[in-house]
From Swiss-Prot:
Belongs to the RNase HII family. It catalyses: Endonucleolytic cleavage to 5'-phosphomonoester. Its EC number is 3.1.26.4. It is found in: Cytoplasm. The keyword Electron transport does not apply. Pfam families: RNase_HII (PF01351). Endonuclease that specifically degrades the RNA of RNA-DNA hybrids. This is Ribonuclease HII. The lineage of its organism: Bacteria, Pseudomonadati, Pseudomonadota, Gammaproteobacteria, Pseudomonadales. Keywords: Cytoplasm, Endonuclease, Hydrolase, Manganese, Metal-binding, Nuclease. PANTHER family: RIBONUCLEASE H2 SUBUNIT A, RIBONUCLEASE HII. It comes from the Bacteria. Residues 12-201 form the RNase H type-2 domain.
Amino acid sequence: MQMGLDFNLVEELVAGVDEVGRGPLCGAVVTAAVILDPRRPILGLNDSKKLTEAKRDALFDEIREKALSFCIARAEVEEIDRLNILQATMLAMQRAVEGLHITPKLALIDGNRCPKLAVPAAPVVKGDSQVPAIAAASILAKVTRDREMSEFELIYPGYGIGGHKGYPTPVHLEALARLGPTPIHRRSFAPVRAAWEAREGHSNTLI
């Protein structure tokens, strides 16, 4: 169902921008910007969180094939810890828009804030359920980040990262307390900081 999407917004060079990964305790925040081609409609677009993994994967390939322009960008863990998650997200969104090979007339940003851009921009609350280009951006960002988390599952076993994607689930928090943070954990986030300090304190006690 696409009842909330306004396909009139596909008629102009409108870029949709969205992010995935503000809430997790580990990994980058990933963003995407997409300019859809009104001559090549993509059926089934919706907020990525409302789609099955198989549907997201299929749309991921179709969006990349049919969009006039798209860019997937990111802010790394180091940037999140240095800037804070909000500013890092704004930076990643800025990178996504600047990475488009076509300059949009307007950038519509999912949420209630806009990054600093060289083009006109407007926030759209729940835009991934209303604006097709934002829905497309949400799919590109989520599939990209989810695949990265599945790879990290192999590099850092024991945390369940491939399942919870870095979000603070009971399984993740228990593993964090038991195993300590990995290099991909965000030490500016309270649960990670607490786990790090607990292990540091334990090490000092042993010394």
